[in-house]
Amino acid sequence: MQLHYSNTDIGGETIKDDDTYLIKDNRALNNLVVSSTRLYRGKQTRGHRHPGQEEVYVFVQGFGKMIVGNEDSKPFNVGPGSVVLIPDGEFHRVINDGDSNMLFNCVFGGMRNH
Protein backbone atom coordinates (compact mmCIF):
# COMPACT_ATOMS: atom_id res chain seq x y z
CA MET A 1 0.00 0.00 0.00
CA GLN A 2 1.38 3.39 -0.99
CA LEU A 3 1.52 5.78 1.99
CA HIS A 4 3.19 8.89 0.56
CA TYR A 5 1.66 11.22 -2.05
CA SER A 6 2.13 14.78 -3.27
CA ASN A 7 -0.51 17.37 -2.42
CA THR A 8 -1.39 17.60 -6.13
CA ASP A 9 -1.84 13.86 -6.72
CA ILE A 10 -3.33 11.82 -3.88
CA GLY A 11 -3.91 8.75 -6.04
CA GLY A 12 -7.18 6.86 -5.75
CA GLU A 13 -10.08 6.35 -8.12
CA THR A 14 -12.14 8.87 -10.05
CA ILE A 15 -15.53 9.40 -8.40
CA LYS A 16 -16.88 12.17 -10.64
CA ASP A 17 -15.61 13.82 -13.83
CA ASP A 18 -17.88 16.39 -15.46
CA ASP A 19 -17.86 20.03 -16.58
CA THR A 20 -17.83 21.28 -12.95
CA TYR A 21 -15.13 19.19 -11.32
CA LEU A 22 -12.93 16.12 -11.20
CA ILE A 23 -13.10 14.23 -7.89
CA LYS A 24 -10.80 11.36 -6.85
CA ASP A 25 -11.00 9.35 -3.61
CA ASN A 26 -8.12 7.48 -2.01
CA ARG A 27 -9.52 4.77 0.29
CA ALA A 28 -6.21 3.16 1.24
CA LEU A 29 -6.91 3.65 4.97
CA ASN A 30 -9.57 1.80 6.94
CA ASN A 31 -11.18 4.76 8.72
CA LEU A 32 -10.41 7.85 6.62
CA VAL A 33 -10.95 8.88 3.01
CA VAL A 34 -8.68 11.43 1.32
CA SER A 35 -10.46 13.12 -1.56
CA SER A 36 -9.04 15.48 -4.19
CA THR A 37 -11.24 17.93 -6.11
CA ARG A 38 -10.24 19.99 -9.14
CA LEU A 39 -12.95 22.66 -9.34
CA TYR A 40 -13.00 24.34 -12.72
CA ARG A 41 -12.87 28.12 -13.15
CA GLY A 42 -16.25 29.81 -12.73
CA LYS A 43 -17.86 26.74 -11.13
CA GLN A 44 -18.98 25.88 -7.59
CA THR A 45 -19.60 22.71 -5.66
CA ARG A 46 -23.17 21.85 -4.85
CA GLY A 47 -23.77 22.98 -1.29
CA HIS A 48 -24.27 20.04 1.02
CA ARG A 49 -24.05 18.67 4.57
CA HIS A 50 -22.69 15.44 6.06
CA PRO A 51 -24.74 14.47 9.12
CA GLY A 52 -22.49 12.52 11.48
CA GLN A 53 -19.33 13.43 9.57
CA GLU A 54 -16.63 16.07 10.06
CA GLU A 55 -14.37 17.13 7.21
CA VAL A 56 -11.08 18.99 6.69
CA TYR A 57 -10.39 20.94 3.48
CA VAL A 58 -6.81 21.80 2.47
CA PHE A 59 -6.53 24.18 -0.49
CA VAL A 60 -3.57 23.57 -2.82
CA GLN A 61 -4.04 25.64 -6.00
CA GLY A 62 -6.24 28.50 -7.18
CA PHE A 63 -8.30 31.08 -5.33
CA GLY A 64 -11.98 31.31 -4.50
CA LYS A 65 -14.45 31.47 -1.67
CA MET A 66 -16.05 29.06 0.75
CA ILE A 67 -19.30 29.13 2.68
CA VAL A 68 -19.57 27.18 5.94
CA GLY A 69 -22.49 27.16 8.36
CA ASN A 70 -25.69 27.68 6.39
CA GLU A 71 -26.56 28.73 2.87
CA ASP A 72 -26.82 32.40 3.92
CA SER A 73 -23.44 32.50 5.68
CA LYS A 74 -20.95 35.06 4.42
CA PRO A 75 -18.36 33.59 2.01
CA PHE A 76 -14.69 33.87 2.98
CA ASN A 77 -11.56 33.77 0.81
CA VAL A 78 -9.58 30.56 0.36
CA GLY A 79 -6.41 29.80 -1.56
CA PRO A 80 -3.19 27.78 -1.41
CA GLY A 81 -2.39 26.99 2.22
CA SER A 82 -5.94 27.58 3.51
CA VAL A 83 -7.24 24.87 5.85
CA VAL A 84 -10.96 24.80 6.67
CA LEU A 85 -12.57 22.63 9.35
CA ILE A 86 -16.16 21.57 8.64
CA PRO A 87 -18.07 20.60 11.81
CA ASP A 88 -20.47 17.66 11.85
CA GLY A 89 -23.50 18.37 9.67
CA GLU A 90 -22.53 21.95 8.68
CA PHE A 91 -23.50 23.22 5.24
CA HIS A 92 -20.50 23.98 3.00
CA ARG A 93 -19.80 25.07 -0.57
CA VAL A 94 -16.66 26.04 -2.52
CA ILE A 95 -16.94 28.77 -5.18
CA ASN A 96 -14.23 29.21 -7.80
CA ASP A 97 -14.43 32.89 -8.70
CA GLY A 98 -10.72 33.06 -9.52
CA ASP A 99 -9.04 33.04 -12.91
CA SER A 100 -7.79 29.44 -12.83
CA ASN A 101 -8.88 25.99 -11.68
CA MET A 102 -8.82 25.26 -7.95
CA LEU A 103 -7.40 22.12 -6.35
CA PHE A 104 -8.27 21.12 -2.81
CA ASN A 105 -7.96 17.96 -0.76
CA CYS A 106 -10.50 16.80 1.83
CA VAL A 107 -10.17 14.29 4.62
CA PHE A 108 -13.23 12.69 6.22
CA GLY A 109 -13.99 9.64 8.33
CA GLY A 110 -15.81 6.54 7.23
CA MET A 111 -17.34 6.25 3.80
CA ARG A 112 -18.41 8.95 1.37
CA ASN A 113 -22.03 9.88 2.18
CA HIS A 114 -22.47 12.53 -0.50
At which residue positions do the language-model features occur?
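Residue-level recognition of conserved beta-strand positions in structured domain cores
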Residues: S36, R49, V60, V68-N70, ...
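Short beta-strand His + acidic residue motifs that chelate non-heme Fe in jelly-roll/DSBH
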Residues: R46-G47, M66-I67, P75, I86, ...
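A short beta-strand-loop-beta hairpin characteristic of the jelly-roll/cupin
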Residues: E54-P80
